[in-house]
């Protein structure tokens, strides 16, 4: 088996480097796993990953979000906390962000090359504006709204 040098492999290497530079381990690990899969006999499993990967990832993310509640690190607030204006704003922001992420999923599927632009933007924001890396679904959702793909 020999290494395949193609544009996809080059893109994955660029994403790995951008992920390392921006301290975005999600991008680094994801691109590295896909590059290894592409370059080995694991390539036959890429269609399964393409079909089910996003759904599995969302389930794992949801488990991660809910686990502090189950472990007791976060307590459910009392009923009075739900009627405060801050709680209403928090719920509205949560709904809005979930809606944005939902808009990002189709965009990432239709135009996956835009993920590279999102990573470059993340690097600039982290490096020069003191930002932190955020999820690509929300960034893609914002992009989808801005370019009219919703």
Curated annotation (Swiss-Prot):
InterPro entries per the UniProt record, alphabetical: UPF0756_TM
Membrane topology: Multi-pass membrane protein
The UniProt record lists the keyword Transmembrane helix: yes
TM spans (from-to): 1-21, 52-72, 81-101, 128-148
Protein name according to UniProt: UPF0756 membrane protein NT05HA_0561
UniProt xrefs under HAMAP family: UPF0756 (MF_01874)
Coiled coil residues, start to end: none
PANTHER family for this protein: UPF0756 MEMBRANE PROTEIN YEAL
